[in-house]
C-alpha cells in the first residue's frame, strides 16, 4: 500500500467518524468482535435447531453449524439487526447488511 493510498483510507475513516459524531450515525462503522461472535452463535444455534442453511453445504465442505454460519456472514446473506446501546442510554438499530456494506467501503 502506497503512502497516498494510506492517506486516502485515513481520510475516509475520518469522514465516517465525523458523520457519526455530527449526525449520530452508527459508530464504529464495522462489526465489533463481540457482535460477530453473537451473530455467528445465534445463527449456528438456528442451524443446529433445524433452520435451512443459506449457502450450499457442499461449498462449505462441512456440516458444522458454526462454519456454515461464518460462511453466511462472510457472504452477507444474514438478515440480522444489530442493537447498539449508546452511552446516553439510547439504543440504535442497524441492519447487518448496511453495516457490512459500510465496512467494505473503508
UniProtKB/Swiss-Prot annotation:
Location in or out of the cell: Cytoplasm
GO molecular function terms noted in the UniProt entry: DNA binding; DNA-directed RNA polymerase activity
InterPro entries named in the record: DNA-dir_RNA_polK_14-18kDa_CS, Pol_omega/Rpo6/RPB6, RPB6/omega-like_sf, Rpo6/Rpb6
Keywords attached to this entry: Cytoplasm, DNA-directed RNA polymerase, Nucleotidyltransferase, Transcription, Transferase
GO biological process: transcription by RNA polymerase I; transcription by RNA polymerase II; tRNA transcription by RNA polymerase III
Catalytic reaction(s) noted: RNA(n) + a ribonucleoside 5'-triphosphate = RNA(n+1) + diphosphate
PROSITE patterns according to UniProt: RNA_POL_K_14KD
Record-given protein name: DNA-directed RNA polymerase subunit Rpo6
GN (gene name): rpo6
Amino acid at each position: 500500500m502506497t503512502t497516498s493510498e494510506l492517506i486516502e483510507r485515513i481520510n475516509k475513516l475520518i469522514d465516517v467518524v465525523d458523520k457519526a459524531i455530527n449526525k449520530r450515525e452508527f459508530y464504529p462503522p464495522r462489526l465489533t468482535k463481540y457482535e460477530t461472535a453473537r451473530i455467528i452463535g445465534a445463527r449456528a444455534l438456528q442451524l443446529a435447531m433445524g433452520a435451512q442453511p443459506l449457502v450450499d453445504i457442499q461449498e462449505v465442505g462441512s456440516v458444522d453449524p458454526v462454519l456454515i454460519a461464518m460462511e453466511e456472514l462472510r457472504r452477507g446473506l444474514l438478515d440480522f439487526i444489530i442493537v447498539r446501546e449508546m452511552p446516553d442510554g439510547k439504543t440504535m438499530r442497524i441492519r447487518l447488511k448496511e453495516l457490512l456494506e459500510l465496512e467494505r467501503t473503508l
